[in-house]
Amino acid sequence: MNTSYSQSNLRHNQILIWLCILSFFSVLNEMVLNVSLPDIANDFNKPPASTNWVNTAFMLTFSIGTAVYGKLSDQLGIKRLLLFGIIINCFGSVIGFVGHSFFSLLIMARFIQGAGAAAFPALVMVVVARYIPKENRGKAFGLIGSIVAMGEGVGPAIGGMIAHYIHWSYLLLIPMITIITVPFLMKLLKKEVRIKGHFDIKGIILMSVGIVFFMLFTTSYSISFLIVSVLSFLIFVKHIRKVTDPFVDPGLGKNIPFMIGVLCGGIIFGTVAGFVSMVPYMMKDVHQLSTAEIGSVIIFPGTMSVIIFGYIGGILVDRRGPLYVLNIGVTFLSVSFLTASFLLETTSWFMTIIIVFVLGGLSFTKTVISTIVSSSLKQQEAGAGMSLLNFTSFLSEGTGIAIVGGLLSIPLLDQRLLPMEVDQSTYLYSNLLLLFSGIIVISWLVTLNVYKHSQRDF
């Protein structure tokens, strides 16, 4: 009996190790290219509005894919979907590396990478729930969470070093390492029984078209893109009201406090993601830093601090409540953006401190936003509501990157508004930082109002 138990325990640990590897490289794939955006812009002679699509393309298919894989896990089985995700992710890596001299091929490769990498966060948690014993699941989730945080932390440093000393195109090959997990996971994971079910393909296509054309509008400001986006969303809303098992539960649309809360949370997440994508451009233009310095010295300390702030935020939520932590997080964000807008011309290390507080504030906000938003849900809405929140969180990051890329390409914003800014290279970034601060404060006030109303109603 002890032998059987030890073998089972060994199998569970092996599964967990390979899941950690997948989780690490999933996050790394998202983070490493961010610091190289200015280099890519220079290589292709493209404005930020176009270059930011290197990250936006990945986040778009990544966010949609997480929802799709989650819904398909019962119908097709985790084993098949994980294998499919790994192969697609590696296929995108090869296309991107081989065709890195062609911008259209690079963007296509990032779309493909995102579609493959989406399988990892969507299915890893399901694997833990199904294969890891109940008494060990908390530790397993905690370990995977720490690995993800570490991936987010070291991603910019690794990306900066490789891009500076070798070439940014080699960053596209990093996800290829996940191929080593295939034989082990195929052996360790059991063969699953496929469950028949309806899958709303039409709904996914309509929603995806609406999202893609909206993002194209935010970078090109072409009205035709906006019209196509609006029409797609209108048809999508009409469609999900008719089908029996829609991709998005239309009943959630009637819960106004929930929808407003999700929107405000998404705006906060998107604003920070847009800011992080702007940092490499800003540090190159204002302080003439190298890609390695931006990744290792400027961004790395902030991304690593997320681990500490996340732990502190969890303790504060238990002791002081979610609103207290939200207020601290928003204060960190808004004050950091405001301070940076006034003191952008100071030494480059000042931005390192700013990023620590920005990402710390984001960590606090993420810790509590799900608690605050879920308070407006009825019990029968909880599953669909939280799935929509997770989907929106991922999608908002891609949207924020696209919008900020578009704003960086608008000459009208490159005007002197603050009297203390002397260097012309700071005007655009200073104005956007001021805008970010205002957006955070407005979103915070609306979220507070939603939470207070939901507390009265439930």
UniProtKB/Swiss-Prot annotation:
<feature type="transmembrane region" description="Helical">
    <location>
        <begin position="432"/>
        <end position="451"/>
    </location>
</feature>
<keyword id="KW-1003">Cell membrane</keyword>
<keyword id="KW-0472">Membrane</keyword>
<keyword id="KW-0812">Transmembrane</keyword>
<keyword id="KW-1133">Transmembrane helix</keyword>
<feature type="transmembrane region" description="Helical">
    <location>
        <begin position="223"/>
        <end position="240"/>
    </location>
</feature>
<keyword id="KW-0375">Hydrogen ion transport</keyword>
<comment type="function">
    <text>Resistance to tetracycline by an active tetracycline efflux. This is an energy-dependent process that decreases the accumulation of the antibiotic in whole cells. This protein functions as a metal-tetracycline/H(+) antiporter.</text>
</comment>
<keyword id="KW-0406">Ion transport</keyword>
<dbReference type="InterPro" id="IPR011701">
    <property type="entry name" value="MFS"/>
</dbReference>
<dbReference type="InterPro" id="IPR036259">
    <property type="entry name" value="MFS_trans_sf"/>
</dbReference>
<keyword id="KW-0813">Transport</keyword>
<comment type="similarity">
    <text>Belongs to the major facilitator superfamily. TCR/Tet family.</text>
</comment>
<feature type="transmembrane region" description="Helical">
    <location>
        <begin position="256"/>
        <end position="276"/>
    </location>
</feature>
<feature type="transmembrane region" description="Helical">
    <location>
        <begin position="81"/>
        <end position="100"/>
    </location>
</feature>
<feature type="transmembrane region" description="Helical">
    <location>
        <begin position="111"/>
        <end position="129"/>
    </location>
</feature>
<dbReference type="GO" id="GO:0015297">
    <property type="term" value="F:antiporter activity"/>
</dbReference>
<protein>
    <recommendedName>
        <fullName>Tetracycline resistance protein</fullName>
    </recommendedName>
</protein>
<feature type="transmembrane region" description="Helical">
    <location>
        <begin position="12"/>
        <end position="33"/>
    </location>
</feature>
<feature type="transmembrane region" description="Helical">
    <location>
        <begin position="201"/>
        <end position="221"/>
    </location>
</feature>
<dbReference type="GO" id="GO:0005886">
    <property type="term" value="C:plasma membrane"/>
</dbReference>
<feature type="transmembrane region" description="Helical">
    <location>
        <begin position="140"/>
        <end position="162"/>
    </location>
</feature>
<feature type="transmembrane region" description="Helical">
    <location>
        <begin position="297"/>
        <end position="317"/>
    </location>
</feature>
<keyword id="KW-0046">Antibiotic resistance</keyword>
<dbReference type="Pfam" id="PF07690">
    <property type="entry name" value="MFS_1"/>
</dbReference>
<keyword id="KW-0614">Plasmid</keyword>
<feature type="transmembrane region" description="Helical">
    <location>
        <begin position="165"/>
        <end position="185"/>
    </location>
</feature>
<feature type="transmembrane region" description="Helical">
    <location>
        <begin position="324"/>
        <end position="344"/>
    </location>
</feature>
<feature type="transmembrane region" description="Helical">
    <location>
        <begin position="346"/>
        <end position="365"/>
    </location>
</feature>
<dbReference type="InterPro" id="IPR020846">
    <property type="entry name" value="MFS_dom"/>
</dbReference>
<dbReference type="GO" id="GO:1902600">
    <property type="term" value="P:proton transmembrane transport"/>
</dbReference>
<dbReference type="GO" id="GO:0046677">
    <property type="term" value="P:response to antibiotic"/>
</dbReference>
<keyword id="KW-0050">Antiport</keyword>
